């Protein structure tokens, strides 16, 4: 039944990397916007430590590796350049995607440069006449643009499959929605982990304030991740129900996911690792009274214990729950894309369609 499918694991990988890049950039931009963007005084992010720079660089690297995987599958890599130079099929989703990915590379790179303290300092040293205020404006503009392009890339990974046509499991508007939510879920879990590991407190008397800002951002992202996971579960259920009633082939493919050869990938990978475990980890990490999480202190616990000059106040805690949630979310999202690609089987042609095709009749 699945012999029609020529795609292996590599397409699922670059769909995953594109979704991770888009989702992480979108979540990071929202967090930075809610935290005040870049400050005029320091020409840097406010109270978020290394999170803006780290998240921007990870998103850029994920997009670059995903593009490399995509180009590696082309028989002639020059075809990738031809997509941008030819406007003969400008209305296709492939062309839209090609330009969106190029825009993503440019905007993500600018965002990473302007979010990293050393590169900002280098820019000011090279162009002293520009001034810190201009860098702040450019950084906030790049942050906003990166968030918009990130959302477009996350949605495009689903639109690319839907545009194939005549494939029951892909021919639904719920697929782009599902992939977008999956990408945002990944981005939120990775962002929560980065806030734990990279949210260092400011020095001196401002240390407590910076810890409070990091705790607030972490808690907001964790709650957002739980909400996105619940939405993803609902859309996944609607997708499965809708594909069951779409056609006999759609019903067969859905059955293969629920109780057939792809069932372990679906239940263990997409559902358990992709949704249930991250949801449980975030619930434990955010609802625990002392913030003990799963084997380690949370940011809330670190805040209550931190005092200026103490070791606890020098770094934000690193709960194991955030590590488990981020890892499971990425693995589960990869499993989701693998099974969606695997069930991408064309409807069999009828005799009338074969005759029409042989006569060149559309």
Locate the predicted segments by residue:
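Alpha-helical transmembrane segments and their helix-start/interface "positive-inside/aromatic belt" motifs
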Residues: 8-9, 43-60, 94-99, 133-144, ...
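Long, contiguous internal "core" modules enriched in hydrophobic/ aromatic residues
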Residues: 15-17, 34, 39-40, 102, ...
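Short, extreme N-terminal leader segments that mark the start of a protein/domain
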Residues: 3-6, 16-20
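Membrane-interface interhelical loops and short amphipathic "cap" helices
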Residues: 1-11, 40-46, 74-95, 157-178, ...
């Amino acid at each position: 039944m699945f012999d029609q499918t020529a795609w292996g694991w590599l397409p699922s990988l670059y769909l995953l990397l594109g979704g991770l890049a888009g989702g992480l950039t979108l979540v990071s931009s929202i967090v930075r916007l809610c935290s005040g963007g870049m400050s005029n005084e320091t020409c840097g992010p406010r109270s978020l430590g290394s999170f803006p720079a780290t998240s921007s660089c990870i998103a850029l690297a994920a997009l670059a590796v995903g593009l490399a995987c995509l180009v590696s599958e082309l028989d002639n890599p020059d075809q990738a350049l031809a997509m941008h130079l030819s406007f003969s099929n400008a209305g296709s989703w492939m062309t839209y995607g090609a330009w969106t990915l190029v825009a993503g590379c440019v905007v993500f790179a600018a965002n990473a440069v302007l979010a990293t303290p050393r590169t900002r300092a280098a820019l000011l040293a090279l162009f002293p006449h520009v001034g810190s205020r201009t860098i702040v404006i450019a950084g906030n503009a790049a942050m906003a643009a990166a968030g918009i392009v990130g959302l477009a890339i996350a949605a495009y990974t689903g639109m690319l499959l839907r545009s194939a046509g005549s494939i029951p499991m892909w021919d639904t508007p719920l697929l782009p929605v599902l992939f977008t939510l999956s990408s945002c879920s990944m981005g939120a879990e990775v962002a929560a982990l980065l806030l734990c590991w990279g949210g260092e407190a400011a020095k001196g008397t401002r240390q407590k304030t910076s810890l409070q800002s990091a705790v607030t951002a972490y808690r907001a992202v964790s709650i957002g991740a739980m909400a996105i996971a619940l939405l993803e579960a609902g859309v996944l259920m609607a997708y499965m129900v809708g594909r069951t009633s779409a056609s006999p082939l759609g019903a067969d493919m859905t059955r293969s996911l629920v109780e057939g050869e792809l069932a372990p990938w679906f239940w263990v990978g997409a559902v358990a690792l992709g949704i249930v475990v991250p949801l449980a980890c975030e619930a434990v990490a955010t609802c625990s009274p002392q913030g003990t999480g799963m084997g380690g202190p949370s940011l809330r616990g670190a805040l209550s214990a931190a005092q200026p000059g103490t070791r606890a106040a020098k770094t934000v805690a690193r709960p194991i729950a955030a590590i488990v949630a981020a890892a499971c979310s990425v693995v589960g999202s990869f499993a989701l894309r693998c099974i969606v690609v695997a069930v991408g089987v064309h409807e069999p042609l009828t005799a009338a369609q074969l005759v029409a095709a042989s006569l060149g009749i559309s």
